[in-house]
């Protein structure tokens, strides 16, 4: 079975490496030299050069070159993991068994953008690692493999990413063997897209901490946006922004204090009143610590 692999993030690297180690025939790779779009961008060329895999780099206007490359390689299946662009119909029609996409959510729920960030911010207790046959929609194709992944209260974007990657790589090896045995007759489950939802693109404002939020909401926001992502932030009275990387929920006896009031300073840690309790800011980028009694 001939596979062309498309991807440009850390999961792409782990998946490609696993396919190579398990002896699958990777006849070509399409990737990017650099991406400012993906916080988890990963260079695949150490693998492609080591194993002498023909590689084409995505550029701004080389779609025709990509199509020619794919037709020349004549793959049975294309794996497209960690790619921001929706593939056109012409590419989807090239491989015999279709193009396999990946989405770290429990499809048909939670299609769309930033699935790990939204899942953590919303306080979900579970998500999923889902592979599907791509169509012209966004995350709407027939599902070929789905495994539930538990989200712990202590999980951050980084730890959840790692958990899902470990699960997803095992899934991929299993269904790749199924493809070799069954080809296009591999089991597929059609999505009921009317029953699901789609998450929107996040904006900068979505990462802003407002202490009128609950302690739980602030805690979830910070752990959703911590490394390798952009980080949650505060906007101070002088319009300066401060990145916040880690917070701890704290009980609060200051019921009459307003949200945003600095209740205590302990070393480099800042205790701040929230709507329903308090948050201790543990890791941050304050150039100068606020004073007790100040408002953030």
Model-predicted regions and their roles:
Residues 1-231, 240, 264-280, 286-287, ...:
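One-carbon transfer enzymes
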Residues 143, 255-257, 292:
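Short, charged, solvent-exposed linker or helix-capping segments at domain edges/interfaces
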Residues 232-249:
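Short, structured protein-protein interaction patches enriched in aromatics and acidic/basic residues
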Residues 245-252, 283-289:
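A short, sequence-level motif marking secondary-structure junctions
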Residues 249-268:
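A conserved acidic, glycine/proline-rich C-terminal tail/linker
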